[in-house]
């Protein structure tokens, strides 16, 4: 911290930090005051969190203004942990504590024996340390092996031996994570995974604001905001959160996935690493939209377990892999910029298959097959959104006559365009469309998009190697059908 801050208890008393308004203020009151100030100034409440302005954020604000402990319920990849970590932006820039205290003792009201003795012995000369907001945030992932000692504390025989203390001395306590979060925020992720007997240990903290250390007749009056996260399936169906603990959680806030493709694209653009340190990257809007729609299609696919959710990380890692495949091609061909294509989305299948949990029917088909279907449906939806007036019958008929087209994802934009030019009318259609064709790279992306739409509608086929050809259904005289999706 800066040298201008008081270094002793006496100096602290004479500073603004020793005023009646600041002295003894709880962390919940601190968060409340800073939140009200931010609302009044019109500043973003939780920087970097998008899409919750009209849903989650108002509920979060109400919980904090009410000084509630709260829980965020949501599927994976819904920014729950990010929201909790953003709470530190509502803390004061600096907090005075007694130097050397394990539990962030307030010099005006120390809760530990160490802190009380330090103030009694040194008085106004008691040294003061200053904590930054990040130092006041303690996060723990709940797992079945977490014990009460981990969270609350326990006897430390080694500390007793080294200090020459009796085992009954309060100085022999090894404090757990909760006491170490005193005057701060304690976040517990995946609360249902915490054993029931450990959840019981949180009762006193949430209701009376204190903890009792096993084997010691002492109470620590903790000042802490408790924030939890959980999966709705665990929280409701499995019943892993014991009822008395549920009753003590002041507010229950539901998170959700982005409601629109545009919003999801903004989140992915913010989070994905696309600005590489070599060649410049030009990401076509079509590719970005198809990449994002893959996640939307996955969330509507009945062969994917929707109880597990489809994380926003799918879109983020998928886009990063798409750019990487395009980067590999650009470097190998000596191109001046990196321009991803739809073929690069197929090359990024590992970013999809690892993030979807399949139902039994999906397991029979395989994740890779379903992932390819998701890409095709995403491309079809993108084309329909951008230009649903295109007549593709001539192109389909050309393939129906037994023609085929293979364009490698390793080919340059010029070579790929020449390949697509062999399909009668294809380049003319994309040039006259609303797809924004300005150069060879744009033309290749537009041609891919136009061909992917009839593949999704099963009027054409696309092999794993990327060869377009006649649909198997049309080959046998069967009418094409659109793949089923869950509404």
Tell what function each PLM region has.
Residues 362-389:
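C-terminal catalytic subdomain
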Residues 277-284, 297-371:
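C-terminal helical "lid" subdomain and adjoining coupling/linker elements of P-loop NTPases
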Residues 2-262, 273-289, 302-306, 379-487:
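Conserved ASCE/P-loop NTPase catalytic core
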Residues 292-296:
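Acidic-glycine-rich active-site phosphate/pyrophosphate-binding loop
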């Amino acid at each position: 911290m800066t040298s201008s801050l008081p270094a002793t208890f006496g100096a602290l008393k004479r500073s603004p930090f020793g005023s009646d308004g600041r002295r003894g203020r709880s962390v919940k009151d601190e968060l409340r005051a800073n939140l009200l100030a931010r609302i009044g100034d019109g500043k973003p409440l939780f920087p970097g969190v998008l899409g919750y302005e009209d849903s989650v954020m108002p509920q979060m604000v109400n919980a904090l203004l009410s000084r509630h402990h709260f829980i965020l319920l949501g599927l994976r990849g819904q920014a729950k942990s990010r929201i909790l970590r953003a709470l530190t932006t509502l803390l004061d820039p600096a907090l005075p504590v007694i130097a050397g205290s394990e539990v962030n003792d307030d010099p005006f009201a120390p809760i530990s024996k160490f802190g009380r003795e330090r103030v009694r012995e040194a008085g106004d000369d008691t040294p003061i340390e200053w904590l930054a907001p990040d130092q006041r945030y303690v996060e723990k992932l709940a797992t079945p092996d977490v014990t009460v000692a981990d969270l609350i504390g326990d006897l430390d025989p080694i500390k007793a031996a080294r200090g020459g203390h009796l085992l009954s001395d309060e100085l022999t306590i090894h404090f757990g994570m909760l006491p170490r979060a005193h005057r701060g925020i304690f976040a517990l992720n995946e609360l249902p995974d915490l054993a029931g007997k450990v959840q019981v240990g949180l009762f006193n903290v949430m209701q009376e604001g204190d903890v009792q250390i096993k084997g010691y007749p002492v109470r620590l009056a903790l000042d802490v905001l408790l924030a939890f996260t959980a999966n709705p399936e665990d929280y409701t169906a499995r019943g892993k959160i014991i009822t008395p603990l549920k009753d003590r959680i002041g507010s229950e806030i539901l998170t959700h996935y982005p409601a629109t493709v545009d919003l999801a694209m903004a989140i992915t653009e913010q989070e994905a690493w696309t600005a590489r340190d070599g060649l410049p990257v030009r990401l076509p809007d079509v590719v970005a939209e198809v990449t994002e729609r893959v996640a939307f299609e996955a969330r509507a696919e009945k062969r994917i377990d929707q109880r597990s959710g489809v994380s926003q990380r799918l879109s983020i890692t998928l886009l990063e892999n798409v750019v990487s495949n395009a980067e590999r091609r650009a470097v190998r061909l000596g191109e001046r910029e990196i321009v991803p294509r739809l073929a690069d989305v197929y090359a990024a299948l590992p970013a999809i298959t690892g993030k979807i949990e399949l139902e039994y029917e999906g397991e029979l088909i395989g994740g890779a097959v379903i992932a390819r279907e998701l890409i095709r449906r995403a491309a079809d939806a993108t084309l329909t959104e951008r230009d649903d007036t295109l007549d593709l019958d001539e192109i389909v008929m050309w393939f129906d006559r037994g023609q085929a087209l293979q364009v490698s994802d390793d080919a340059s934009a010029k070579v790929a365009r020449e390949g697509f030019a062999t399909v009668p009318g294809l380049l003319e259609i994309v040039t006259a469309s609303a797809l924004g064709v300005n150069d060879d790279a744009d033309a290749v992306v537009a041609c891919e998009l136009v061909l992917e739409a009839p593949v999704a509608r099963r009027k054409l086929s696309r092999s794993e190697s990327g060869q377009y050809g006649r649909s198997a259904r049309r080959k046998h005289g069967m009418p094409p059908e659109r793949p089923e999706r869950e509404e």
